[in-house]
C-alpha cells in the first residue's frame, strides 16, 4: 500500500491538537495502530526533538529570526529523513502536526523574513517531500487567542508570547497559501463545534483518499 502524507496546520487556538487526537483515534480503529503514524514539528526523532527544545525555550528571547527559521528547517530535514520517508515507504498514513506551511506563515510572514525566502530554505530541507493533503484549521485571530487564554493547560512556550499583529500575519499568510494551492490545502472553519470540525476534516480526507473513513461516507 502506498503511504499517505497529511499535514495539519492552524492558527493558535484553532483546536488542532483536539482535532488531531480524534482523527488519529478513529483512523487507528479503521486501519490499525501500526498503519498510522502521528508526528509533530518541530520534533519527531530525538535530534529534531532536541532542536525543538531550543526553539520553544521561553528563555531564548534573544533568538534571531533567521536563526529561528534555520532551526525549524534543520529539525524538518532530520524529521524527513528519520521519520517521514521511512513511514511512507512502509505504506503508513502520516498525520503530521505542522510542516512547511508553518514556517512560511510564522517565520516568512510574521517574522518578516519573506514567504518566498523561507520557502527556498525549506526546499533544501525537504528535498521535494510535500504533503498530498494539508488540513488548515482557520479561526479569527481574536477568537483563537481567547480560546487559548480560557482553555490552555500546557506550558506556554516562546512562540506564545507574541503581539496581536504577529498572529494576524500568521493567519493572513495561511489564507494566502490556501488560495494559492487549493488542490492541496483544504480550509476548515474551526469556529464551529469540535464535532462539526472533526466531521469536516474527515470529509476532506475522504475526498482526497476515498479509502479513509469509507465507512462514514
Identify the residue ranges that each predicted region occupies.
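A glycine- and Lys/Arg-enriched "phosphate-lid" helix/loop adjacent to the NTP-binding pocket
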Residues: 102-172
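ATP-dependent small-molecule kinase phosphotransfer cores
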Residues: 30-126, 200
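Hydrophobic anchor at the beta1->P-loop junction of P-loop NTPases
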Residues: 8
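Walker A/P-loop
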Residues: 17
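P-loop (Walker A) phosphate-binding loop of NTP-binding proteins
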Residues: 11
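ATP-binding Walker
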Residues: 14
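NTP-dependent small-molecule kinase module
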Residues: 22-26, 142-217
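Pre-Walker A (Motif I) flank of P-loop NTPase domains
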Residues: 2-5
Amino acid at each position: 500500500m502506498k503511504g499517505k502524507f497529511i499535514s495539519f496546520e492552524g492558527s493558535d487556538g484553532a483546536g488542532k491538537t483536539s482535532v488531531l487526537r480524534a482523527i488519529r483515534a478513529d483512523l487507528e480503529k479503521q486501519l490499525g495502530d501500526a498503519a498510522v503514524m502521528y508526528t509533530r514539528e518541530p520534533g519527531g526523532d530525538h535530534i529534531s526533538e532536541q532542536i525543538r527544545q531550543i526553539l520553544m525555550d521561553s528563555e531564548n528571547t534573544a533568538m534571531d529570526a533567521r536563526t529561528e527559521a534555520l532551526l525549524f528547517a534543520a529539525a524538518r530535514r532530520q524529521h524527513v529523513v528519520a521519520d517521514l520517508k521511512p513511514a511512507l515507504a512502509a505504506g503508513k498514513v502520516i498525520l503530521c502536526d505542522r510542516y512547511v506551511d508553518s514556517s512560511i506563515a510564522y517565520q516568512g510572514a510574521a517574522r518578516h523574513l519573506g514567504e518566498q525566502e523561507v520557502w527556498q530554505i525549506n526546499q533544501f530541507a525537504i528535498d521535494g517531500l510535500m504533503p498530498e493533503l494539508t488540513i488548515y484549521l482557520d479561526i479569527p485571530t481574536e477568537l483563537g487567542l481567547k480560546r487559548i487564554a480560557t482553555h490552555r493547560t500546557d506550558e506556554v512556550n516562546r512562540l506564545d508570547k507574541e503581539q496581536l499583529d504577529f498572529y494576524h500575519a500568521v493567519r493572513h499568510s495561511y489564507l494566502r497559501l490556501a488560495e494559492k494551492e487549493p488542490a492541496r490545502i483544504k480550509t476548515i472553519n474551526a469556529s464551529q463545534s469540535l464535532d462539526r470540525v472533526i466531521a469536516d476534516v474527515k470529509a476532506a480526507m475522504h475526498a482526497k483518499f476515498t479509502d479513509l473513513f469509507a465507512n462514514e461516507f
